[in-house]
C-alpha cells in the first residue's frame, strides 16, 4: 500500500500520508508532523 509523500495532494478524511506526515485540512496536502 503506497503512502503519500511530502506535498502530495491528499484527502483529510482519508489520510494516506506517509508516517510522520499528516494531511493538512486547509491546504489538502501532506505536511510533516513535528
UniProtKB/Swiss-Prot annotation:
The modification Leucine amide is found at residue 34. Keywords: Amidation, Disulfide bond, Ion channel impairing toxin, Knottin, Neurotoxin, Secreted, Toxin, Voltage-gated sodium channel impairing toxin. GO terms for cellular component: extracellular region. Disulfide bonds join 3-18, 10-23, 17-30. It holds the Pfam family Toxin_12. Expressed by the venom gland. It is found in: Secreted. GO terms for molecular function: ion channel inhibitor activity; sodium channel regulator activity; toxin activity. InterPro entries: Huwentoxin-1. The presence of a 'disulfide through disulfide knot' structurally defines this protein as a knottin. Negative results: has no effect on voltage-gated potassium channel human Kv11.1/KCNH2/ERG at 17 uM. Belongs to the neurotoxin 10 (Hwtx-1) family. 34 (Jztx-26) subfamily. Spider venom neurotoxin that blocks voltage-gated sodium channels Nav1.3/SCN3A and Nav1.8/SCN10A in human (IC(50)=2 uM and IC(50)=4 uM, respectively) and rat (IC(50)=2 uM and IC(50)=2.5 uM, respectively). This is Beta-theraphotoxin-Pmu1a. It comes from Pterinochilus murinus (Mombasa golden starburst baboon spider).
Amino acid at each position: 500500500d503506497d503512502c503519500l509523500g511530502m506535498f502530495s495532494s491528499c484527502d483529510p478524511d482519508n489520510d494516506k500520508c506517509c508516517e510522520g506526515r499528516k494531511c493538512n485540512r486547509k491546504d489538502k496536502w501532506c505536511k510533516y508532523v513535528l
